[in-house]
């Protein structure tokens, strides 16, 4: 079979708008993209390997330049043919939803993988391992999936005119956007529309997923993130609509928020994070909300879990906690709601359905900085920044580390150092490596497992740094004082 005929088969299989009668038409569409010389190009049974063959042929035929951006743009165009139109996708999704939410999400997830919108091969490169801690097994990932920028594309982008369209990577405007040297190709991207709080929202999957069925729920309007009572209402509405998914929001302040504060969105998916498994340590009373169970979660960060079968009462209780926290100051533990009139408090909320009940975890956040901690008082401190210095966002709050790609090679050099072998270990790891060398015996047989455990301990410390009420006696007494204010 040729690459062209194989891809025609993929298109007909995935896109109900085409049948085998369209084979000649589709063949000509493909030749227009990759060049007539590719007509007899030998194919591969694997659709993604077959895709690679066509992209390579297009480059050899002079249809695209030799750059990463050009290859990705063509990949998306070739897979766009295999993807139903946005209106058709939405019709099919909501038709399938009638048979059950899981039926619809399973179908949309499978399509988003099959059409290469979800970059399954890139995601497979990520390093993932568990790490035992006093808080349960944390999840450690070294993120290798996002491709490094091609120097040719960087140079081209520097000279390109800035259109400002799409406004950002989360906008509805990205659906079907061809892409350019400085903006990802999204021709094969599709978004499910739904109403949330009386407004149009979109539901899509993340192309570089950090966990199973990593979903993004986004406001149709490009407006900044905000955490208020409507946030809690929206999150509970989403888990009612998609009960097999959790959903949460990044905080709405710098340092403690995510990397995208300019567009209102939430993240969710079908994954049980370590924080969801963590038990309640201490029960808490929420004034005026007797039907809401509340408690402090055994977790390195400061988390209050609210549980109720009544979503309205849960929303009101969560808003009460948020409002008290947003005004709460305790100088004895460096917790300050305002400094010079500037607000520093917010929450990272996470919602789940557990049987007939709703769960809402509120993670207390404070984004102050100081001379001692210029990156953030409640942010990874300097001595752990050799492993993690970026913001602690929603996913990491829940116990899944998203560590930078540099660590794959850097930790390999640390291992060589610990084994007494020749190495090029970065100086920033030396203090930590010396502590590990003094404390443990290192052999070629145990070095990888012990290194993973050590990284897990550092990540637990990172989360403790981000916790506003520390796990020591002083911090826990301060947490109890805050809870009494509720």
From Swiss-Prot:
Its main location: cytoplasm. GO terms for molecular function: UDP-glucose:hexose-1-phosphate uridylyltransferase activity. It catalyses: alpha-D-galactose 1-phosphate + UDP-alpha-D-glucose = alpha-D-glucose 1-phosphate + UDP-alpha-D-galactose. Its EC number is 2.7.7.12. GO terms for biological process: galactose metabolic process. Pathway: Carbohydrate metabolism; galactose metabolism. Belongs to the galactose-1-phosphate uridylyltransferase type 2 family. This is Galactose-1-phosphate uridylyltransferase. The gene is galT.
């Amino acid at each position: 079979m040729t690459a062209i005929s194989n891809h025609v088969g993929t298109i007909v299989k995935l896109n109900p708008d085409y049948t085998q009668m369209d084979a000649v038409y589709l063949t000509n569409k493909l030749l227009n993209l990759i060049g007539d010389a590719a007509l007899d190009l030998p194919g591969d049974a694997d659709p993604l390997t077959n895709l690679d063959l066509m992209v390579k042929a297009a480059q050899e035929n002079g249809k695209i330049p030799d750059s990463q951006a050009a290859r990705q743009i063509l990949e998306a165009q070739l897979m766009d043919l295999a993807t139903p139109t946005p209106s058709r996708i939405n019709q099919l999704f909501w038709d399938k939803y009638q048979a059950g939410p899981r039926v619809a999400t399973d179908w949309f997830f499978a399509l988003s993988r099959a059409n290469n919108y979800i970059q399954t091969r890139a995601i497979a490169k990520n390093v993932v391992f568990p790490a035992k801690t006093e808080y349960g097994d944390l999840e450690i990932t070294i993120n290798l999936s996002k491709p490094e920028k091609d120097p040719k594309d960087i140079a081209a982008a520097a000279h390109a005119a800035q259109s400002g369209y799409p406004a950002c990577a989360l906008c509805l405007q990205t659906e079907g956007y061809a892409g350019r040297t400085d903006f990802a190709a999204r021709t094969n991207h599709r978004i499910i529309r739904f109403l949330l709080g009386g407004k149009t929202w979109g539901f899509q999957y993340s192309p570089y997923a950090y966990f199973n069925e990593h979903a993004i729920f986004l406001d149709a309007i490009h407006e900044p993130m905000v955490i208020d009572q409507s946030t809690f209402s929206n999150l509970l509405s989403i888990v009612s609509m998609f009960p097999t998914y959790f959903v949460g929001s990044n905080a709405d302040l710098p340092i403690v928020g995510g990397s995208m504060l300019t567009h209102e969105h939430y993240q969710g998916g079908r994954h049980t994070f370590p924080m969801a498994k963590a038990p309640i340590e201490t029960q808490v009373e929420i004034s005026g909300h007797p039907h809401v169970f509340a408690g402090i979660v055994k977790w390195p960060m400061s988390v209050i879990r609210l549980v109720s079968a009544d979503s309205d009462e849960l929303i009101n209780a969560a808003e009460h906690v948020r409002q008290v926290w947003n005004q709460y100051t305790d100088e004895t533990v460096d917790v300050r709601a305002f400094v010079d009139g500037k607000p520093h408090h917010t929450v990272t909320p996470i919602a789940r359905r557990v049987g007939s009940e709703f769960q809402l975890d509120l993670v207390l956040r404070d984004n102050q900085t100081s001379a001692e901690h210029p990156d953030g008082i409640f942010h990874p401190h300097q001595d752990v920044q050799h492993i993690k210095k970026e913001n602690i966002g929603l996913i990491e709050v829940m116990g899944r580390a998203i560590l930078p790609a540099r660590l794959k090679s850097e930790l390999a050099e640390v291992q060589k150092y610990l084994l007494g072998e020749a190495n090029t270990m970065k100086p920033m790891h030396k203090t930590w490596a010396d502590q590990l060398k003094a404390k443990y015996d290192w052999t070629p047989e145990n070095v990888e497992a012990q290194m993973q455990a050590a990284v897990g301990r550092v990540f637990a410390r990172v989360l403790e740094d981000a916790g506003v009420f520390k796990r020591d006696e002083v911090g826990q007494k301060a947490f109890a004082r805050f809870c009494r204010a509720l």
